[in-house]
């Protein structure tokens, strides 16, 4: 059985190894007798994915961010800002707050900064950093905001503990995540369900968790936060919302699933005909007699003051 080396870890010739080879963006860290995965983004870093993220942000502004606003003068850390898809909304809705947005990808940060400049915003600074090695002193920020990041981490609980330490007492940590297991649609399709499961499995293979939305409450409590509140944010689409059918079903969710086609086939999770049938059936739910439903989860916790 042929093996390959990824960093310091030898990976056997399995679908996991093939998926790792294909993505070429996975790095490993030894942690005792096991390993964790860092810097693994199952959707990839390419222009179409950046466009999908922008479409997603635009479609979900009201649903996810209507109740997100920070007081004048507050300093907010946005972790994992990516291409700035959420950053612009945050900065617009809290024009007198100061944002420091960080990401590990220099290319993503460059695009995010360009988006901020194009929007004429001046209350955002950017910094390149690893989530698990953030170069900031404890209690440096009034608030921390994290959106669609935990699902890609092999150690989400550790990350939340880091974010909590960076908060000042009485500061808030806001986390937004999806949950692919919440997806339901009509017409029903086993092929579409299997295509979605390919994405869930691939994300698990590289250390992430596409079902993490349902876990936000216990994760935030375990991080030591108080007064934790989690609210489901459901996207429901039928023929009465053709704008959302295009923006969310087609350009956001189905585009996300379709984007892992090559990885899923290479990893042995499906074949091209089955996967393509599933994607077609997902697009089919955007037609006049189709229905689509998906749930995001938004959690907010407060850092307690010292006893």
Identify the function of each model-found stretch.
Residues 132-143:
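A short acidic, Gly/Pro-enriched loop at the edge of an enzyme's catalytic core
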Residues 38-58:
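Class I SAM-dependent methyltransferase Rossmann-like catalytic core
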Residues 40-42, 48, 229-290:
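C-terminal helical/coil "lid" or tail adjacent to the Rossmann-like core of SAM-dependent
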């Amino acid at each position: 059985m042929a093996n390959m080396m990824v960093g310091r870890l030898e990976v056997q010739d399995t679908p996991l190894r093939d998926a790792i080879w294909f993505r070429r963006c996975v790095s490993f860290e030894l942690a005792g007798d096991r390993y964790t995965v860092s810097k693994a983004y199952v959707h990839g870093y390419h222009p179409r994915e950046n466009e999908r993220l922008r479409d997603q942000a635009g479609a979900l502004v009201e649903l996810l961010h209507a109740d997100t606003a920070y007081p004048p003068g507050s300093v907010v850390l946005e972790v994992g800002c990516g291409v700035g898809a959420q950053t612009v909304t945050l900065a617009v809705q809290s024009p007198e707050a100061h944002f420091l947005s960080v990401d590990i990808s220099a290319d993503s940060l460059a695009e995010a900064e360009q988006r901020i400049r194009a929007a004429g915003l001046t209350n955002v600074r950017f910094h390149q950093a690893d989530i698990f090695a953030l170069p900031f002193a404890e209690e440096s920020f009034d608030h921390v905001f994290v959106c669609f990041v935990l699902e890609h981490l092999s150690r989400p609980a550790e990350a939340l503990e880091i974010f909590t330490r960076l908060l000042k007492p009485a500061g808030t940590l806001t986390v937004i995540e999806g949950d692919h297991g919440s997806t339901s649609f009509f017409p029903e399709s086993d092929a579409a369900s299997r295509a979605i499961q390919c994405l869930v499995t691939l994300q698990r293979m590289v250390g992430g968790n596409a079902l993490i939305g349902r876990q936000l409450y216990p994760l935030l409590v375990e991080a030591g936060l108080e007064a934790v509140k989690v609210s489901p944010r459901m996207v429901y689409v039928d023929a009465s919302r053709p704008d959302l059918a295009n923006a969310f079903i087609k350009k956001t969710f189905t585009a996300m699933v379709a984007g892992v086609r090559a990885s899923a086939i290479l990893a042995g999770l499906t074949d091209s005909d089955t996967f393509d049938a599933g994607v077609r059936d997902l697009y089919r739910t955007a037609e006049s007699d189709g229905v689509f439903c998906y749930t995001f989860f938004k959690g907010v916790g407060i850092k307690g003051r010292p006893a």
